[in-house]
Design a protein with these regions (language model features):
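Phosphate/nucleotide-binding beta-alpha loop and adjacent structural elements of enzyme active sites
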Residues: 1-278
Length: 278
């Protein structure tokens, strides 16, 4: 992921124009999910409305509306007000880490999110990082080797324990898929974690819904803060919040988008205080 605005600014005083044609620029890429399924926004309008009305603050509503409108109309102007904010991803100002002791980094890739949590929460109790790619797993171990109370798990997160095919040739987008040439081990969070979990981050390239199904007990009993990427599949923009709220309705929901492009949309779930339960 790059900061496109910063890159474009370096081209000044050359003329700049908005042009969005990914398939023409990169014909070797497979069809992008939202490019061939924009009818979802129309067909499932009531579901998008449901999520929109659940969002906690005005900024969430504005950003959600702009991202969905872009995916419906492919009008890049809907992305014009977004800025590259990767350093703030998963740790927004509305999230207090005061009572967050145990952090689960689902899809750790290079360990940067775990490291960012450690920097922000000096007195953490434990970090559990899941990374199925052997190469990335070693990178995470190396990055976090100087810190205590770190558990790096060379497995993916799923709804149950099994072996699945995995495509490891896509860098940070490596994912579970039937055509993958590698076999990886996957586990559910409910099966593999006994301790109380306070914060779950999920960026696992489209496997988020299965991971949520495998964490029902934790979501009900522990009520962790959750930061879940929803941009991998078009319907994740409403399916993921619906799933989590069906498991445990006692959450406030926020939405933030972190680039000027189609990637890095995150839905946040903050547990309600007992006095806020309806």
């Amino acid at each position: 992921t790059i900061d496109s605005e910063k890159l474009i600014d370096t081209l000044q005083p050359l003329a700049r124009s908005n042009y969005f044609a990914i398939q023409l620029a990169f014909p070797e890429l497979p069809e992008i999910d939202f490019m061939v399924n924009t009818e979802s926004v129309i067909r499932d309008a009531n579901h998008y409305d449901f999520v929109f009305n659940k969002l906690e603050d005005v900024q969430s509503k504005i950003e959600y509306q702009n991202v969905v409108n872009f995916r419906l109309n492919r009008d890049i102007s809907f992305l014009s007000n977004f800025r590259f904010r990767i350093n703030e991803q998963y740790f927004e100002e509305f999230i207090s880490l005061n009572n967050i002791d145990t952090f689960v980094d689902g899809g750790s890739f290079d360990g940067q999110t775990s490291l960012e949590f450690i920097r922000r929460k000096k007195d953490y109790s434990k970090v559990i990082a899941f990374e199925p790619s052997s190469q990335s797993y070693l990178a995470v171990c190396d990055k976090l080797k100087d810190y205590k109370f770190i558990d790096v798990v060379n497995k993916g997160i799923w709804n149950k324990s099994e072996s699945l095919s995995f495509n490891s040739d896509l860098g940070s987008a490596s994912r579970i898929e039937n055509e993958g040439t590698l076999k990886i081990e996957v586990v559910s969070l409910d099966e593999s974690l006994d301790e109380k979990i306070d914060f779950i981050k999920l960026d696992i390239e489209g496997a988020e819904k299965n991971a949520i199904l495998g964490a029902k007990r934790i979501i009900i009993e522990n009520k962790p803060v959750m930061a879940v990427c929803v941009y991998h599949h078009q319907e994740d923009y409403f399916r993921i919040p619906q799933m989590i709220l069906e498991i445990n309705p006692h959450y406030k929901v926020y939405f933030r988008h972190y680039t000027q492009g189609v990637f890095e949309s995150v839905m946040y779930f903050l547990p309600l205080k007992p006095t806020q339960h309806v």
